[in-house]
Amino acid sequence: MGTRKADPRQPDKQRAVRVLVALNAPMYSTSALEAAANLAARYHSELEALLIEDEELLWVANLPFTREIDRVSGALRDMDNVRVVRALKVQRQFLNRALVGVCGKLKVSSRVRVVRGDFLSEALTAAAEAEIAILTRASHTATPPPAGQRLLRTAPARGTRRKPVWSLFDGSPASGRALIQAGTIAAEGATELVVAVPESAAGGRRKLETEARTLLGANAMRARFVVVPRAEIGALFQSMWPQGCRLLFLGRDSIDLSTRQTAAWLKQPACPMVVMA
């Protein structure tokens, strides 16, 4: 009797999986942290939080002629490098507390790594070395929030409609693994799953929809399928914008993450991306 061949799109919990979440120092969301912790728990992996501090911001703060507007009074004042560094230190403390809280509930070990540089460059470099990477947006905030300001976004108010979870499925093994996790996250959050299928995908969109429903199993009942003209961030963004997005799941090779479109995406108030190898 032959041995049944494993589906490469199904998660292999026996192998070591590196789970990483890349966070912009001035702002990060609870959705990204919770999704990362949940994925780390499923794979029995440690969660690595990469906190990226804006190197350019620190350089600007050192210039003698740099000014900033006070958030409270609106007054123009000198930009203080010492205050910026102090605020960044406070943010690391906030992140550590947030990780302890989120990961403690799931009994997931975690660690924080801090780097300074360009957010997109550092995030993509780190993502290329991880089996699962969660990328949050690059904030437009010019300076870090004051030390006492709450950094984490709060949960939606009671009665507020939950934003759907999105997944790009093109038939590749990585996009299949991403789809399975997206379905699980959507089910656990009692929210809708929107599956984006590229119109230009090989084999045709109907075949992909059938394949996606098979992979989702019982979670296919909450799935809604949309067709995007091509597998690009811009096309996805146009589809997502009217409905909103909680998380976007995709395979690492489904979209070129090094393009200007990706950089623009990560600067928008959009949802975190979960990139799976």
Description of each model-found segment:
Residues 2-78, 161-228, 235, 245, ...:
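Small/aliphatic-rich secondary-structure junction motif
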Residues 4-5, 15, 29, 33-35, ...:
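Gly/Ser-rich helix-loop-strand patches that form or flank binding pockets
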Residues 40, 103, 127, 186, ...:
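A generic structural signal for well-ordered alpha-helical segments
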Residues 76-86:
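Short glycine/proline- and acidic residue-enriched helix-loop micro-motifs
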Residues 84-102, 106-108:
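Ordered, amphipathic secondary-structure segments that act as subunit-interaction surfaces
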Residues 95, 99, 211-212, 261-265:
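A general structural detector for well-ordered alpha-helical segments in enzyme core domains, enriched
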Residues 110-112, 225:
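Hydrophobic/aromatic anchor residues within beta-strands of the central parallel beta-sheet
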Residues 117-120, 228-234:
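Conserved active-site histidine-acidic residue motif and adjacent donor-binding/catalytic loop
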